[in-house]
Amino acid sequence: MGETDEYCRPASLADLKALITSLNRQQVDYLLIGGYALFVHGYHRATTDIDVLVPATVESGTKVKSALMMLPDQAAKDLEPEWFAEGDNIRVADAFLVDVMLNAGGETYDTLKRYATTVDLEGIPVQTLSLEGLLRTKQTMRDKDVSGRHILERALNLVREHSGE
């Protein structure tokens, strides 16, 4: 962890639900990715942050900033919507970490939106990716991407076996 996030606690399910509710309320185009995306699909992988992939636009930055103002420490107040158009991922270190991703494993919101699916999380609609879409975000050689890729490949094989593909 970097020095800016050493004071953050791990994100909880309650944090995820509050964040997704706020993103939905602000009508943010987003896709939940990473460990919590696996969780909403029914697979468990240890994670400490919440990763959301958003379009790399100023408009998206404005909406995301508004949505993130629900975070307890209001760290999002320092975000500049113009940063989003630059395409670099943004880490918001508040009470818990939110990684606002503008690219993931070489993929963007626009290249992945065809894999978008909505999953119900205790009555909250969550915009995320299908398992195939999530696998596309795990094509790097980082240790956690390699392990995530193995989990996703096994899950996809199970789904295919059950559907007769």
Label every model-predicted segment.
Residues 1-165:
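Compositionally biased terminal segments of proteins
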